[in-house]
Design a protein with these regions (language model features):
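Bacterial N-terminal signal peptides that target proteins for export
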Residues: 1-7
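Aromatic-lined carbohydrate-recognition surfaces of secreted/lumenal glycan-active proteins
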Residues: 236-254
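Acidic, His- and aromatic-enriched active-site or binding-groove loops in soluble protein domains
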Residues: 113, 119, 182-185, 189, ...
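Bacterial signal peptide processing site
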Residues: 20-22
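C-terminal motif of bacterial Sec signal peptides marking the signal peptidase cleavage site
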Residues: 16-18
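Substrate-binding cleft of extracellular glycoside hydrolase catalytic domains
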Residues: 49-225
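Functionally critical loop-and-helix segments that line ligand-binding/catalytic clefts
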Residues: 39, 45-66, 73, 257-337
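Glycine-rich, charge-decorated loop segments at or immediately adjacent to ligand/cofactor-binding or catalytic sites
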Residues: 125-131, 249-261
Length: 337
């Protein structure tokens, strides 16, 4: 069960009615020590890379898929909302919206830190490439007798039934489909992520988080997809590949991604953004999600908050740094350099 929910409930209530400048909330969060993360790292034998770099924890951020507009973003930043950073969605295969594009300078000038997100291919709960059934509505014409006595007559009616049929191949212009999950597509999407991040003017060393939604089963082909994505970003050398992942898949994905870092001669640990609702509290460190390697913890999903007269549907996160994608490392630190 979730513990110490008081501050989180206060934030939700303030979001509904609009609150003051929020300075006391931010300062109380920032006052927490990162020693908790270091203890968790020591206890599990894992590293807490971003937590190790700071002694001020608990930087609140939000993410929302559709850009709320400049006015809303500025109103939140200046109107008491406790959020120091925001997700920044690149146009990507499973998130083609371009609303965030070109907003890097606008948002940073407002004082926002940024977490760059690239929503790659997903399994959508099935085995990529395997035949699967989808519900299809089928219409048919049938005869029916209506009326009584001398007025009884035959009419035609259309009946719609839902049946399961084998899914067709992806449309020629499709960009997002479980059947696209493959190593070659991972490399293609990795190159696309790098190109789009560079086009928006992000500095070398910026972390790009590949969004991997929860998978009850993690197919080998998906593991090859995201490893190829990571290898491609590493090989380019300008940016750092990170991962957004659900806690259910986090350990396996982390081990896979870390192996790609080491194979590329990289000494850093990959930045991870872990989603888990249970136990979330805005005063906690990301590593308290249960994975000492977590740099960001997403703990509240699909809520609406209103600050300074602007309502936005958001997910709530806590990061070890004020700008999760700005990790403060050079883009190509290699073993032996």
């Amino acid at each position: 069960m979730r513990q110490d929910r008081g501050l989180l409930l206060l934030l939700a209530a303030c979001g509904a009615i609009g609150c003051g400048d929020g300075s006391s909330t931010r300062s109380s969060i920032a006052g927490l020590s990162a020693n908790v993360a270091e203890f968790a790292a020591a206890a599990t034998g894992q590293k807490a890379p971003m937590a190790d770099a700071t002694k001020n924890a608990g930087h609140l951020g939000f993410d929302t898929g559709t850009y709320p507009g400049d006015a809303a973003m500025l109103a939140w930043r200046t109107g008491g909302a406790p959020y120091e950073w925001t997700g920044y969605y690149l146009p990507s295969p499973c998130h083609p919206d371009e609303g965030w594009s070109g907003k890097r300078e606008t948002l940073t000038s407002m004082g926002y830190g940024l977490a760059v997100v690239y929503v790659g291919q997903q399994t959508w709960g099935r085995m990529p490439g395997a035949p699967h059934l989808v519900p299809v509505q089928v219409k048919r014409r049938v005869k029916a007798r209506v009326g009584r006595g001398a007025k009884r007559r035959t009419v035609w009616r259309t009946i719609t039934n839902t049946v399961l049929r084998r899914a067709p191949a992806p449309a020629p212009d499709a960009t997002c489909n479980a059947d696209f999950v493959a190593p070659a597509r991972g490399a293609q999407d990795g190159a696309d992520a790098v190109s789009r991040t560079a086009a928006d003017g992000f500095a070398p060393g910026t972390t790009i988080f590949l969004d991997l939604e929860r998978m009850d089963a993690l197919p080998q082909v998906m593991r090859e997809y995201y490893k190829a994505w990571v290898r491609t970003v590493l090989a380019d050398g300008r940016f750092m590949p990170g991962i957004y992942v659900h806690t259910f898949n986090a350990n396996t994905v982390y081990a896979d991604v870390k192996s790609q870092y080491r194979a590329a001669g990289r000494v850093e640990d990959p930045p991870f953004w872990v989603a888990k609702s249970k136990g979330f509290d805005v005063t906690k460190l990301p590593s308290e999600v249960g994975h000492a390697f977590a740099a960001v913890w997403q703990g509240v999903l699909d809520v609406e908050q209103t600050w300074n007269g602007h309502k936005i549907p958001i997910d709530v996160n806590v990061s070890a740094t004020q700008s999760p994608s700005a990790v403060g490392r050079p883009p190509a630190v290699r073993v032996g350099n």
